[in-house]
């Protein structure tokens, strides 16, 4: 080896140093791939930043010193970056002008604790050649799904069943704001009667616009695109089983940047730890909503 190094004008120290570095890089890459694949076994479509948060301590324990940029470079080279998907979304909001509409009670409030505001929405689930409809109730602060129901129709019975489930997670005597879009299911007499009987308050978007119920829409997207609920299920029971498992994993395993990389379950158990990051996120979202409203108002005025 000395003769070869002399022939090419290299020292053996430089040669072995370079070889050691190459081997170290290969070992580090192998560790990263192994740790990422372990996470993806449970959260197959989790994005890179959240995956890095989940594996960085384990990598440190493995002796791998790596920053986020290098981590993303390895994911890219190994074909492990997640490509965001979009799917066709059938309309699930049906507005009935004959039904009463609640005021938007959440527009200007700061949500800083669990059981303060729930956001509700309905999203489609493909079952065979038909659609089923998933009603969800999510806590606005800690982002956990606390109520859900899969129905074969868009009747109000779906949101009512989801709300009944959600109510079981709320301490007795707590007056929660139940926020939703203006869909006829949420404006129905039966749904509003249940909200009142539970001691909750009804709130609705002022406009039929997704920005005014963005938190609920976001959860829909996460469950579909990160937990594969956008696929076509063979049977209704298969869909229900997949939804139950997806919600359990979402609540207990998926970190949220808006919660300081805590899971929804962790945020509910330790709201004080999640609050600083959550409040900054709420303020940022509020400003974005105000800018969006101003643009829409300007567009209407120009028209």
Task: Name each model feature, range by range.
Residues 4-8, 15, 36, 51, ...:
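Mobile genetic element proteins and their domesticated derivatives, centered on retroelements
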Residues 17, 144-148, 202-205, 229-230:
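Short small-residue beta-strand/loop micro-motif enriched in glycine and branched aliphatics
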Residues 2-22, 44, 242-261:
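K/E-rich alpha-helical interaction surfaces of small helical-bundle regulatory domains
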Residues 9-114, 209, 265-277, 285:
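Basic, flexible linker segments flanking DNA-binding modules
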């Amino acid at each position: 080896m000395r003769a070869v190094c002399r022939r090419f004008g290299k020292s053996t120290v430089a040669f072995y140093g370079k070889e050691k570095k190459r081997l170290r890089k290969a070992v580090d890459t192998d560790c990263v791939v192994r740790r990422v694949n372990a996470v993806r076994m449970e959260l197959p479509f989790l994005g890179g930043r959240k995956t890095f948060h989940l594996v960085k301590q384990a990598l440190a324990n493995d002796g791998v010193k790596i920053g986020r940029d290098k981590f993303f470079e390895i994911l890219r080279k190994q074909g492990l970056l997640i490509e965001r998907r979009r799917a066709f979304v059938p309309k699930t909001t049906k507005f009935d002008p004959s039904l009463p509409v609640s005021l938007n009670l959440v527009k200007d409030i700061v949500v800083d604790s669990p059981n303060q505001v729930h956001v509700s929405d309905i999203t489609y689930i493909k079952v065979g050649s038909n659609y089923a409809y998933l009603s969800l109730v999510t806590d606005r602060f800690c982002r956990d799904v606390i109520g859900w129901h899969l129905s074969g129709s868009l009747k109000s019975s779906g949101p009512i069943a989801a709300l009944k489930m959600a109510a079981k997670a709320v301490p007795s005597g707590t007056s929660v704001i139940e926020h939703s879009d203006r869909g006829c299911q949420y404006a129905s007499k039966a749904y509003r009667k249940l909200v009142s009987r539970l001691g909750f308050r009804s709130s609705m978007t002022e406009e039929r616009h997704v920005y005014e119920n963005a938190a609920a829409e976001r959860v829909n997207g996460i469950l579909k695109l990160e937990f594969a609920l956008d696929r076509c299920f063979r049977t209704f029971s298969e869909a229900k089983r997949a939804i139950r498992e997806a919600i359990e994993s979402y609540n207990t395993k998926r970190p949220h940047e808006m919660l300081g990389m805590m899971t929804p379950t962790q945020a509910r158990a330790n709201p004080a730890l999640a609050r600083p990051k959550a409040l900054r996120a709420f303020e940022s979202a509020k400003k974005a909503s105000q800018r969006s409203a101003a643009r829409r108002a300007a567009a209407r005025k120009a028209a």
